[in-house]
Amino acid sequence: MDHEGCQGQHPQQCCQWVSNAWSEFLDLLKNAETLDIVIMLLGYIAMHLTFVSLFLSMRKMGSKFWLGICTLFSSVFAFLFGLVVTTKLGVPISVILLSEGLPFLVVTIGFEKNIVLTRAVMSHAIEHRRIQAQNSKSGKRSPDGSTQNMIQYAVQAAIKEKGFEIIRDYAIEIVILVIGAASGVQGGLQQFCFLAAWTLFFDFILLFTFYTAILSIKLRSTVSSVMSICVWPLRMMASRRVAENVAKGDDELNRVRGDAPLFGRKSSSIPKFKVLMILGFIFVNIVNICSIPFRNPSSMSTIRTWASSLGGVIAPLSVDPFKVASNGLDAILPTAKSNNRPTLVTVLTPIKYELEYPSIHYALGSAASNPAYNDAFHHHFQGYGVGGRMVGGILKSLEDPVLSKWIVIALALSVALNGYLFNVARWGIKDPNVPEHNIDRNELARAREFNDTGSATLPLGEYVPPTPMRTQPSTPAITDDEAEGLHMTKARPANLPNRSNEELEKLLSENALREMTDEEVISLSMRGKIPGYALEKTLGDFTRAVKIRRSIIARNKAAADITHSLDRSKLPYENYNWERFFGACCENVIGYMPLPVGVAGPLVIDGQSYFIPMATTEGVLVASASRGCKAINSGGGAITVLTADGMTRGPCVAFETLERAGAAKLWLDSEAGQDMMKKAFNSTSRFARLQSMKTALAGTNLYIRFKTTTGDAMGMNMISKGVEHALSVMANDGGFDDMQIISVSGNYCTDKKAAALNWIDGRGKGVVAEAIIPGEVVRSVLKSDVDSLVELNVAKNLIGSAMAGSVGGFNAHAANIVAAIFLATGQDPAQVVESANCITIMKNLNGALQISVSMPSLEVGTLGGGTILEPQGAMLDILGVRGSHPTNPGDNARRLARIIGAAVLAGELSLCSALAAGHLVRAHMQHNRSAAPSRSTTPGSSHDARLTGHDQCPRALSVNNVDERRRYSEVKAIDE
């Protein structure tokens, strides 16, 4: 009976404590000022924003959940340790004090140290893996190539790099908090500073112990997962390249295997864990034995006295009686002064009255009247010293029903976490660099033959005629991050039973397409159950979706006679980050088109050197531009001037009568109309700013040409959004509700079409580039002279283009350079039509050649569109113009326009020089004609065979050899 009363006492005390805390909180809230409540609310909001910032920072480093939650656990443990030490030292800490101080402590201190340490560890791990990859490519075997050594290296290097900085920050913060604890300021500042100092101390310890261990485990788990994903499919596929590499390295692997231990590489994680457990058990027993002289409770009196004195120094009284009695003292003092007599006042400690139910006193009385259980419990463990009393206290606390449930939950979580950690340690035992079995050369040869002669599988119930076997295309290089772009198709058992159409449709309705084979998905798609455009969204695997779409197109009866070889064509589709394409750049994807990219230069533009990336299939184009760059650099480089920056959009609106259309035109041309439209347009974007509007009337149709800046984006979508809103404001607020919007784009822009309006009024960026080439450089590098170039430019670029009625085409080949740079940097290739508008002017300036190009409608951007793709973004990186400019939006796009203008200048200079010297045809015959043996991969007609046979006669070969030598010497002289 006594035992039950003891058990029932704890829940009542907990409920009473919660009730008291809630009532104190309500009293505090009622008596608090509005400003204090607002400050506390802002503090809590800032604290939660700090948590969000922590998870966002960890997400950028590759951890969506675990590192962030482990950081919070580490900080919570540090706070609990600090709270225990503070209360044991006699410093009173209330819930109100914690609720008021913790948000500001979290916001002030934050989790920057954990983020800094994590970033350093990850960067050193990536650096270590890159060094390993370089060594493996060069044939070197690194002695520290294992995952465990990589993690050890990353942690040690990170601590060496950032350890002093972290310790310094901790020391400064703890010193400041100690000063606050010793300041003597009342109101809870001393107690909270004391608690915060201990919390930071334990946070420092846990950062380099608990959190570092979790970080190492996370790194090991990530590396093990990546290795298992990459190694397992390669073993199953047994491709030709893997077979050759393994066969060539068989002797070396045997040598390594001979030096390795019998059971593979040893993983020291589990043995170390066992040793630490045994040492901990021994340490507990040693402490228990050493505590025998101190089993007398009186021997601890000194420590208790010191702790209580320290608590008395730091902790003031919980209630200040003079503050409570301030109202009474204020009333007594004037009375004493008026009566002119001394008054003695005694201030007593306030008494707090609480209303409780009588049942509480009955329960407390029954428990207090039967202390036999408590006395027996303490008497039983009294003779066992400090360790015995500690164990006794723990056993007694287990009798609390609430606490026991939490302990069971904690034990369950501990078991689950330990199981996960042991699995991670078990993964580390196997070394992925050492094969698990002997390599059978016969099996490798059979696998090679299988890969070389693999035939396509037929769809269900449909026959497709076989196609001639083609050579296996080379594997394209990985263009994006391997961790993001590598998608392996799930292996399918070869002996899987065929499912009926009803079963397949049932799986489709259950969204279980991942359980189907490729042939089953193809069958459903060809029967119209899965739309071909929705394969990526339906399958959830972009690479597999592209592969299946190729097979579907190859088997489509409408064009099977010409597309039957698509699924085995040399158009690559693997090892590409298709997520960037989806919903942004292309639909119905069947692969990607590798395009050669070269660089021309370096070219000095406005005092800075650039290498110009150019994606082209035209021979000698990059070489010609490089020769022009060399000549321009010899004259001091190119100078550019930006003359305009404004993208245009020309909508078409209509009215019922010409009178209304004319009134609308006059209103748009007026100052009031301009102001209203500009205000409406500018409200749609923080980058788009309307510069001007130009109107034209054709009958009852009114064309309005909006011209606006668009930041670093090319801006077509941005300006279209602004035009729609401005026209809506014009109809509703401008008094033209009878206006009918025919089209947002009325070809008055003019976009992707040759138009005199773009040539006259400009569109996009307007750029003029100039260079002065000394006469000696013209003769030595360009193999021409100044007067010949000036004469050729007038006759060809000026008079010749005028005779042809050209609009903006007064140049030699500006579109060549513009198109190549557009493809390399992710610009819109269709806008080469107006972007290549250019006039080239040459003059003889005191014996030197002065050349300039003027391009009034260059439409480029460094943000959005094709620039989101990693290869194109990499080309923008080498120009230093990727993305939006951090301080002045629009500068990156304007700099790209200057670079393109200077590159066009180099191309114009080189081509005109080649034309003047008569080198153009010979250079193209040398570099821009494919060799005859390239026809061997494509079946040709009998006519092609006759031509090929004629070209291979001994006489033709002898003549070609002489021509080749002569052309090579001439082109080499041109390039030099």
Curated annotation (Swiss-Prot):
Transmembrane feature ranges: 37-57, 65-85, 91-111, 170-190, 194-214, 273-293, 402-422
Instruction: Name its pathway.
Output: Metabolic intermediate biosynthesis; (R)-mevalonate biosynthesis; (R)-mevalonate from acetyl-CoA: step 3/3
Compartments it resides in: Endoplasmic reticulum membrane
Question: GO biological process annotations for this chain's record?
Answer: coenzyme A metabolic process; ergosterol biosynthetic process; isoprenoid biosynthetic process
What's the protein name?
Answer: 3-hydroxy-3-methylglutaryl-coenzyme A reductase
User: What Enzyme Commission number(s) does the record list for this chain?
Assistant: 1.1.1.34
What residue spans carry the region label Disordered?
926-954
- Which residue numbers delimit the SSD domain? 36-217
* Lumenal compartment segments: 1-36, 86-90, 191-193, 294-401
- Binding residues for CoA, per the UniProt record? 624-630, 781-783, 923-924
**Disulfide bonds listed in the record:** none
Q: Which residues form the active site?
A: 618, 752, 828, 924
Return the broad EC class.
oxidoreductase
Describe the reaction catalysed, as an equation: (R)-mevalonate + 2 NADP(+) + CoA = (3S)-3-hydroxy-3-methylglutaryl-CoA + 2 NADPH + 2 H(+)
Q: Which residues bind NADP(+)?
A: 685-687, 712-720, 928-929
**Record Pfam families:** HMG-CoA_red (PF00368), Sterol-sensing (PF12349)
The record's family statement is: Belongs to the HMG-CoA reductase family.
